[in-house]
């Protein structure tokens, strides 16, 4: 019996390690980076991250093979879903101006292992995104020279007939990644200046495309004789919108750069809103122009926009578009290489990844080791994988990060901020609830006197409510919710919300096509999932939120992040099975890294004092007055069978 209790105690403590949250410093503006980026810098960085290969390559691929002219609708859906996610990023970026983006946001609200998995997937997202851009850059340059580069490579380097790999090695794409890596290592100020130059050229070319495109537009290209507006139907539109997410993944570079922003509280939300609005408008208008210029089924997926002008007899315009596309893709590549090492740095700085990647160059003030190593890995990916495989793999990691950031917004909105010096949840003795206190005469134990003083004030003065407590207006109807600690019901409700959203989207996606459910069971499952989803929203909504702050706050919480979670999960399920398989393999690799290194070297793990389990606790004897008798006592121990077992039993008794 004692052995079983010891083992269960060890397991409980280990699970507690996995879900610990990050302790924020009191001074969030303190950083080893150089805070030099303005709102304009961040906005152009975001535009550069979004408007690139997605505009010049992805539009042609999706229009021809997935959605047809209805790619316009696909971009609208993807833009709305991205807007919901972007607003979540904006709130976090303003409140937590630390590098790390989705990884950091998850760490301070959900827990360590989830943050590591999100960070691990964001690393993959940026590596694949940069490799895909380099592949697209190479393809566009090759099209200018009539595919002579490709033909030369196939003749002299040979071709590959290996599943999941490209048909031939792309040395040009690999080389451009290495060159961009060298530029990024010069520092944030130089990278920002270089991005300004390429972004200005790109935006000028986009204006040229829109003006010339509408002049050359042929409305009959959307007619039934050419296949109609939506030749692939609703399914094609939704599948296209899932892939279109690739076009918008660049906005999180703004949140990643928050530790280098001069005034992150204002600059981050403004830059995200402006850049996403401009990028969405550009994608919708350009995809409209493209499918109106030439029939969608005749598009060249590798260089759709330039080829469209060639086919209309404006070869000079095609050269301008090709040159502009190369500049635009340079901005995306720089954006990915700018963000990737900063995510790696954030994880290494927290102890979850190898410490060597936390080194910052004293002169350039950038994580140069992370830049060089992961820039090289990105160049290898661009060398051996083709664009289509890279793009599909990219979307799933992005959508998962968006989902966890949305959930993190809800959790953080309904809990007290945790700063350095405060106890982390789960490290203290459980505090009895008010109802438990009223219904028992047993003394109640706490690990600090301040814990009890805080709770006594809340028990005696119901008007003093903290985030996560039941609103006073709902106490007559939902009084049983007062039995739980502040934020506990919200945390459980967020889990229920995510599970019910996953069930609902799974039924909508697979219920008729894959599972072939009868109508009655299909309807019943949708109804039950919808009720669970709505019920969890209601339970969250009846609790107190944080008071309004001076920083940007997402409107309509929890509804807005809940919609973001639903849309993200729906789009994830529209991706192919092979994408999920590759994603699962990457997750397994990440778990191996975490359990072999991260969980033991985490700085939050080092914060746990070895003497924590033997400090004095306080016993509080209930009384009818505000002042209660408080007496310090020594830690409890149970009868021991050896010194080690006695110590472990004492720790288990406290927990």
Cite the ranges covered by each PLM segment.
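Extracellular loop-to-transmembrane helix junctions
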Residues: 34, 55-161, 275-278, 586
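Membrane-helix boundary/coupling elements in multi-pass transport proteins
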Residues: 59, 98, 121-139, 243-261, ...
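Helix-loop-helix junctions that connect adjacent transmembrane segments
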Residues: 28-34, 72, 148-174, 196-322, ...
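C-terminal membrane-solvent junction of multi-pass transporters and transport-like membrane proteins
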Residues: 165-169, 231, 357-366, 405-576, ...
């Amino acid at each position: 019996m004692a052995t079983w209790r010891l083992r269960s105690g060890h397991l409980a403590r280990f699970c507690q390690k996995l879900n610990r949250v990050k302790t924020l410093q009191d001074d969030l503006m303190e950083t080893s980076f150089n805070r030099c980026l303005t709102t304009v810098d961040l906005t152009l960085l975001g535009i550069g991250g979004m408007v690139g290969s997605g505009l010049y390559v992805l539009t042609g691929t999706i229009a021809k093979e997935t959605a047809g002219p209805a790619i316009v609708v696909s971009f609208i859906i993807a833009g709305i879903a991205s807007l919901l996610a972007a607003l979540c990023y904006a709130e976090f970026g303003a409140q937590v101006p630390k590098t790390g983006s989705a990884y950091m946001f998850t760490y301070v609200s959900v827990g360590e292992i989830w943050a590591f998995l999100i960070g691990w997937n964001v690393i993959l997202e940026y590596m694949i995104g940069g490799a895909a851009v380099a592949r697209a850059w190479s393809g566009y340059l090759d099209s200018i020279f009539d595919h002579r580069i490709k033909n030369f490579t196939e003749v002299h380097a040979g071709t590959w007939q290996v599943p999941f790999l490209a048909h031939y090695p792309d040395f040009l794409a690999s080389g451009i990644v290495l060159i961009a890596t060298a530029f990024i290592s010069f520092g944030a100020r130089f990278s920002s200046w270089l991005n300004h130059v390429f972004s200005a050229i790109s935006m000028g070319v986009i204006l040229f495309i829109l003006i010339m495109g509408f002049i050359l537009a042929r409305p009959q290209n959307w007619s039934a004789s050419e296949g109609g507006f939506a030749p692939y139907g609703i399914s094609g539109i939704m599948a296209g919108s899932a892939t279109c997410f690739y076009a918008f993944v660049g906005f999180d570079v703004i949140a990643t750069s928050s530790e280098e922003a001069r005034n992150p509280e204002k600059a981050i939300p403004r830059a995200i809103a402006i850049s996403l609005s401009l990028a969405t408008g550009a994608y919708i208008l350009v995809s409209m122009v493209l499918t109106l210029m030439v029939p969608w089924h005749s598009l060249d997926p590798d260089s759709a926009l330039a080829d469209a002008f060639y086919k209309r007899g404006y070869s000079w315009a095609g050269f301008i578009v090709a040159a502009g596309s190369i500049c635009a893709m340079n901005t995306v590549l720089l954006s990915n290489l700018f963000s990737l090492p900063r995510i790696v740095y954030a994880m290494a700085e927290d102890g979850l990844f190898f410490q060597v990647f936390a080194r910052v160059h004293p002169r350039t003030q950038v994580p140069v080791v992370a830049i060089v190593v992961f820039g090289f890995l990105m160049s290898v990916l661009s060398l051996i994988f083709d664009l289509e495989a890279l793009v599909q793999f990219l979307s799933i990691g992005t959508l998962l990060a968006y989902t966890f950031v949305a959930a993190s917004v809800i959790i953080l909105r309904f809990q007290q901020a945790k700063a350095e010096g405060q106890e982390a949840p789960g490290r203290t003795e459980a505090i009895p609830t008010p109802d438990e206190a009223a219904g028992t005469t047993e003394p109640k134990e706490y690990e600090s006197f301040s814990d009890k003083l805080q709770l006594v004030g809340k028990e005696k003065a119901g008007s003093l409510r903290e985030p996560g407590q039941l609103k006073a207006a709902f106490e007559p109807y939902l009084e049983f919710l007062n039995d739980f600690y502040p934020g506990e019901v919200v945390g459980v409700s967020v889990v229920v919300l995510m599970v019910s959203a996953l069930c609902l989207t799974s039924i909508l996606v697979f219920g008729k096509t894959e599972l072939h459910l009868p109508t009655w069971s299909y309807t019943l499952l949708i109804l039950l999932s919808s009720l669970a989803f709505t019920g969890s929203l209601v339970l969250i909504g009846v609790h107190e939120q944080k008071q309004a702050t001076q920083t940007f706050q997402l409107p309509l919480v929890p509804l807005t992040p809940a919609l973001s979670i639903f849309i993200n999960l729906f789009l994830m399920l529209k991706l192919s099975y092979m994408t999920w398989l590759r994603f699962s393999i990457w997750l397994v690799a990440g778990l191996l890294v975490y359990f072999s290194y991260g969980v033991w070297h985490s700085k939050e793990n080092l914060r746990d004092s070895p003497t924590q389990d033997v400090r004095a606790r306080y016993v509080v004897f209930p009384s009818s007055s505000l002042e209660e008798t408080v007496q310090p006592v020594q830690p409890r121990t149970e009868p021991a069978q050896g010194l080690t077992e006695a110590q472990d039993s004492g720790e288990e008794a406290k927990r």
